[in-house]
Amino acid sequence: MSEHIYIFNPEHDLCIANGDENFVPPRSAVGFAKENIDLSEHLRRTNKQSRNIIPWGWNHSLKKRLINEGVDPATLPSEEELQFIRTHSRREFALDVHSRLNCGDSQVIGADYRIVATSVNEIEAFISAYGSAVLKSPLSGSGKGIRFVREGLSESDEGWCRRTLGKQGSVIVERRFEIIKECAMLFECHHEGIDFIGYSLFETKNGAYSRNILASNEDIEDIIAGYISRDTLTAIREGLTSVLADTLVGHYEGFLGVDQMICQTASPVFVPVSEINLRMTMGLIARNQYDNDHN
């Protein structure tokens, strides 16, 4: 189907969060990759990428590993590219992209539902204003680096905040909503631009990925359109394509996913940018698997 070499390295987020090329992922993370090697078959899809090697995600640790295995460094991402990926894997990038979308629709929540806090005082003020919140470290693995708080910070919460501020410089603080549905828009970034690939529909538990639902793009769009208009959904998709292209084209080549949520407030609202993953996602695997099985 393709001459590309695909690498399933789901420990990528941990490597990105650590940042050291000599980082050794926990045995459990490496074990997950080995135990689920069959998933690598669903990484394959027609693409416009120039590199022969297409991993789950690029990071310094993977590059060093490939060089040690004899891969020509000239065929791998440069230091500047890897640093760009790490910088834009921080959760601040999701907030930035959200703030640049111009939806103008009451069904779509604005970017101010969260802040980038650089002090414990800012965090406490936000919680005081909204009663409960979700705290997220800028970089973390799936389900890690996330805390749910209500009515103020406990001693443990405050300690976590201070450590995260010291190590990563900020804490993302979000209003906590009741989640109705979680979905994502999937894209491929290449030297010519950004292409929309499709949707994914998934579930999480306490911030950690749980499972994807296999469904057609049309069926997933129908589900989302039960809460917001198709015109609004189209505007968000086109807006994301434009904003992401402005930032990523020429600096990043690969797949990415923009996680989204439908949440219950006084009425359902759509969060157009919850997280941005500059890597492959389980949603992409689900999309590929469904499309390959039905084409």
Give the residues covered by each predicted segment.
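N-terminal "leader" segments that precede or initiate the main folded domain
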Residues: M1-N47
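Structural motif
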Residues: I7-H12, W56-S61, R176
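Conserved N-proximal alpha/beta basic substrate-recognition cap immediately N-terminal to
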Residues: A29-S128, G141
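Glycine-rich phosphate-binding loop of ATP-grasp-fold ATP-dependent ligases
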Residues: Y113-R114, S132-E158, E182-A184, N206-I224
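Extended, Lys/Arg-enriched charged tracts that mediate electrostatic binding to polyanionic substrates
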Residues: V120, I127, P138-K144, R150-E151, ...
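Phosphate-binding site of ATP-dependent enzymes
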Residues: G131, S156-R211, G257, M261-V273
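A conserved active-site cap/scaffold subdomain adjacent to cofactor or substrate pockets
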Residues: G198-H251
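ATP-dependent carboxylate activation and anion-phosphoryl transfer catalytic cores
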Residues: D231-N295
